[in-house]
Amino acid sequence: MKYDIIRLMSAELWNFKNVAHGKLEMPGAACRDFSGDRSEILGIYGQNGSGKTTVIDALYFAKQLLTGHALPSDAGDYIAKNAEEAVCALSFYLGSQDTGFAVSYEFTLHRASHGAYVARERLSRRMILEGKLSPAKRLIEYDANAEGRFLSPISRWNEVLASLPEAAVELAVARKLCIRNASSFLFSAETAPIFSGCCRKDAESGEAFENIFSALSSYAAQGLFVISSDHSGTIALEASLPLALHFDGDDKTPDEMLLSLTEPSVQPSDTYKIVKISVESLNCVLGVLSPDMKLEIREYGGQMTPDGRDGMRFEILSVRGENRIPLKYESEGIKKLISILSILIAMYNDASVCVAVDEFDAGIYEYLLGEILRILEESGRGQLIFTSHNLRPLEMIDPKNIVFTTTNPENRYIRLDRSGGGNLRDRYIRSISVGGQKEELYGYTNPLEIARAFRLAGRCGDGKS
């Protein structure tokens, strides 16, 4: 079954980096609006080191697992230092003309000598009746460390074993591989053929078990885009440009392509076609954001790729009037916009696209930043989650679309109390200064102590005590 819309509803974290516990709800889910008629924007604000980037990291981990890929080798470093496990639970809305329900995917990372592995996974489903969520029903649960039966409930275990003659052996092998590779068991390539045989429909929702698996996996591959701070860091190095791509109907399209800024790039012919289409799409918007600017592709002819496929050698140029310059010499802000514009266009036009961007404001002029967010909020269709330090968006978008980090690791994310009047920016600064919210928003720093610390640091540098 193909769903008309899939959207992220909420994210809840336990012991992820410096977040002991925190929950974020998308604006639509918070007011039980699942229509998908308009965009949802969620901005995350707070002081440095308060847990903003942790949300983006958790979404990246979820995307890796749902698409069957391994977690990064340093995954163990994302588990809080005082804990052995970190947990992330994401809720999604799956809707069609006939029905709509919420599916929760929860995964647990366990610290290990080689980093971390996925110790537990759980899929559950909740029906939506008159805007209210029914109690959660467990669809399947995996426990990597269980002895004997490691899938629950027992009815699902029996169903899976009955689907193939050698299912028990194949499941045991898949479990070992997933632990070693730090990948998902439920969404791995090894278990997909086994679970595809479990087509018994859920009695309450009338939905086949297999359909939910394939829907979440396809959504993570084609609809969920995560842009980390490493993305901006790569641009700042001026050696390459990470170009985030979205291409409808092609689950083989790479999420991100690294284009060299110091020499022409070589890409396979099929990927190059996508680059050409993307550049045409980018030019429709780029000339409005940066007047009189467009991109142009200069081809240098066919060239075989390192893996032996037919490819094209090309370079992307920045064009302003009659002047053409290599993209390397454009400003960091322009390169940042170019690198993520394709997926922002997709988010604007597709209700089932969710874009998560860390440090969205990096290198972008604050007035332009506010205008982009306002347009995406007012007339877009998809979802955007972003972190930022620039306070201009607080004046431009609806207050319900902003959450703030707190100094309490047990309750890391909150929305501001609406009392007190004034725009959100003024209320936020006032709350930092005099309090008045449910949680403290800022760990106080004394300006005199900061000045004294700078003086002491200078003496240390001079070798004086």
Model-derived regions, located:
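Switch/communication elements of ASCE P-loop NTPase nucleotide-binding domains
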Residues: 1-68, 73, 310-453, 460
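Short, well-ordered strand-loop elements centered on a beta-strand within folded domains, enriched
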Residues: 10, 99-128, 152-155, 303-319, ...
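Short, surface-exposed beta-strand/loop "edge" segments at domain boundaries and coil↔beta transitions
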Residues: 19-20, 94-103, 125-138, 305, ...
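Conserved P-loop NTP-binding catalytic core
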Residues: 42-43, 56-114
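Hydrophobic, Leu/Ile/Phe/Ala-enriched alpha-helical segments that form helix-helix packing faces
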Residues: 59, 63-66, 109-111, 278-294, ...
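Broad, structure-driven detector of short, well-ordered beta-strand segments within folded domains
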Residues: 100-111, 131, 137-140, 293-299
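Electropositive, glycine-dotted interaction segments
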Residues: 112-288
